[in-house]
């Protein structure tokens, strides 16, 4: 039975990367998500149960507890909803230990580690033949870039990504579309498709 579920970790990490990109999340923020951290947005009912994501483990100032924020799903990233639905309803139940609340439980039942996510991203990046300068955080940078290009208000973007100062967000405003990051996105999609293929073979 264990071998028949070997595709699940690949599907999980690919979905994590898609979520990090679609909501502009830091590595620790996305890996720390629990099942209860999503809710409907009354102002955007078309997104169903994934209209709002509650980040409870945001980057903290030194000596302070983790910052919390709410991130709204925006139409440009609506595609992530089907990815999340598939993970939550179809795939996660196949692997989640009893009573686990983690959105992305590891094979041992605990939270997936930050190092595991970095290794997964590195593998995707290498498979795509991209520069080593790209890292997991590039997904978040790309989110900000797209939000700026799509004309969202600077303060809204700042609130979405949890930047303490507007100047931090403004660093991204001079960036142009990064083809390399988009290639990474395509590679992640291929990883998901490969994982789905695995479900059909078992």
PLM features: residue spans?
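Basic, Lys/Arg- and aromatic-enriched nucleic-acid-binding interface segment
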Residues: 1-27
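Short, basic (Lys/Arg/His-rich) helix/loop patches that form interaction surfaces
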Residues: 3, 110, 118-159
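Short, leucine-enriched amphipathic alpha-helices that occur as contiguous helical runs
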Residues: 9-14, 114, 118, 140-141
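A short, glycine-centered helix-capping/turn motif at helix boundaries
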Residues: 19-33, 150-152, 163
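Conserved tyrosine-mediated DNA breakage-rejoining catalytic core shared by Y-recombinases
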Residues: 32-83
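C-terminal catalytic core of Y-nucleophile DNA break-rejoin enzymes
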Residues: 61-85, 99-122
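Catalytic-site neighborhood detector that most strongly recognizes the C-terminal catalytic loop/helix
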Residues: 161-187
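C-terminal secondary-structure termini that scaffold catalytic or DNA-interacting sites
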Residues: 187-202
């Amino acid at each position: 039975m264990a071998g028949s579920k070997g595709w699940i970790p690949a599907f999980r990490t690919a979905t994590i990367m898609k979520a990090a990109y679609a909501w502009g999340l830091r590595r620790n923020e996305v890996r720390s998500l629990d099942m209860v951290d999503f809710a409907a947005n009354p102002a955007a009912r078309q997104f169903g149960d994934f209209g709002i994501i509650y980040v409870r483990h945001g980057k903290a100032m030194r000596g302070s507890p983790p910052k919390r924020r709410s991130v709204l799903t925006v139409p440009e990233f609506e595609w992530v909803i089907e990815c999340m639905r598939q993970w939550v309803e179809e795939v996660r139940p196949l692997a989640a230990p009893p009573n686990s609340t983690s959105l992305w439980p590891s094979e041992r039942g605990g939270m997936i580690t930050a190092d595991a996510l970095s290794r997964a991203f590195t593998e995707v990046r290498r498979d795509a033949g991209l520069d080593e300068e790209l890292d997991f955080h590039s997904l978040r940078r790309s989110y900000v870039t797209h939000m700026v290009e799509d004309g969202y208000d600077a303060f809204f973007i700042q609130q979405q990504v949890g930047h303490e100062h507007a100047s931090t967000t403004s660093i991204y405003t001079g960036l142009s579309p990064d083809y390399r990051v988009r290639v990474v996105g395509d590679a992640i999609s291929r990883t998901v498709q490969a994982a789905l293929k695995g479900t059909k073979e078992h």
